């Protein structure tokens, strides 16, 4: 990579850090190419990205972003996972790390908040934005369904009383 390519890469990575909702930094020493491809594929399917960058370039790219506090995590063989949804990158990275011991989560950032490895894991346990929306819609729909059942119940009860009265008169 010559200087111009490095400048372009740093500018691109800086933009990715600024736009992302969360960033996860992990060591990937010992991961095979197939495992790394699997991680990239899972992250892409979830709406995130995985990037391996030189530590020096990643630290430069972090300057001027909210995630600048995680620059100290870039030592050794590091991989960066990021996504616009704050829950996506931590969730996919933690799930992958559970299956592959060689991916070791070092920490990350969500906006200006710097997270340690435990913080990333607890963030991964939260429901995603889509799951929260589904729960909210369910909460809104439930009272409406109950109201519909309650308003139709008296009519059904009246019909049953009239039917029972009619059967009683026929029997007599």
UniProtKB/Swiss-Prot annotation:
Signal sequence bounds: none
One biological process term in Gene Ontology: translation
GO molecular function, one term: structural constituent of ribosome
Domain of life assignment: Bacteria
InterPro entries the UniProt entry points to: Ribosomal_uL10 (IPR001790), Ribosomal_uL10-like_sf (IPR043141), Ribosomal_uL10_bac (IPR022973), Ribosomal_uL10_bac_type (IPR047865), Ribosomal_uL10_CS_bac (IPR002363)
Record-linked PROSITE patterns: RIBOSOMAL_L10
Keyword set, alphabetical order: Ribonucleoprotein, Ribosomal protein, RNA-binding, rRNA-binding
GO cellular component, one term: large ribosomal subunit
Subunit structure: Part of the ribosomal stalk of the 50S ribosomal subunit. The N-terminus interacts with L11 and the large rRNA to form the base of the stalk. The C-terminus forms an elongated spine to which L12 dimers bind in a sequential fashion forming a multimeric L10(L12)X complex.
Family membership: Belongs to the universal ribosomal protein uL10 family.
PANTHER family: 39S RIBOSOMAL PROTEIN L10, MITOCHONDRIAL
NCBIfam families listed in its UniProt record: PRK00099.1-1
Purpose: Forms part of the ribosomal stalk, playing a central role in the interaction of the ribosome with GTP-bound translation factors.
Protein name (database record): Large ribosomal subunit protein uL10
Organism the protein comes from: Brucella canis (strain ATCC 23365 / NCTC 10854 / RM-666)
Source lineage: Bacteria, Pseudomonadati, Pseudomonadota, Alphaproteobacteria, Hyphomicrobiales
Gene this chain is encoded by: rplJ
């Amino acid at each position: 990579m010559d200087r111009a390519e490095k400048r372009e890469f740093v500018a691109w990575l800086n933009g990715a850090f600024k736009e992302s909702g969360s960033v996860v930094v992990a060591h990937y020493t010992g991961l095979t190419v197939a495992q790394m491809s699997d991680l990239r594929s899972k992250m892409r399917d979830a709406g995130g990205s995985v990037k391996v960058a030189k530590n020096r370039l990643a630290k430069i790219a972090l300057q001027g972003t909210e995630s600048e506090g995680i620059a100290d995590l870039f030592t050794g063989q590091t991989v960066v996972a990021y996504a616009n949804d704050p829950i996506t990158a931590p969730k996919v990275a933690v799930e992958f790390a559970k299956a592959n011991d060689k991916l070791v989560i070092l920490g990350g950032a969500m906006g200006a908040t710097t997270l340690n490895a435990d913080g990333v894991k607890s963030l991964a346990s939260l429901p995603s934005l889509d799951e929260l929306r589904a729960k909210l819609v369910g909460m809104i729909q439930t009272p409406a369904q109950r109201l519909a059942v309650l308003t139709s119940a008296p009519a059904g009860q009246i019909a049953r009383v009239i039917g029972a009265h009619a059967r009683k008169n026929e029997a007599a």
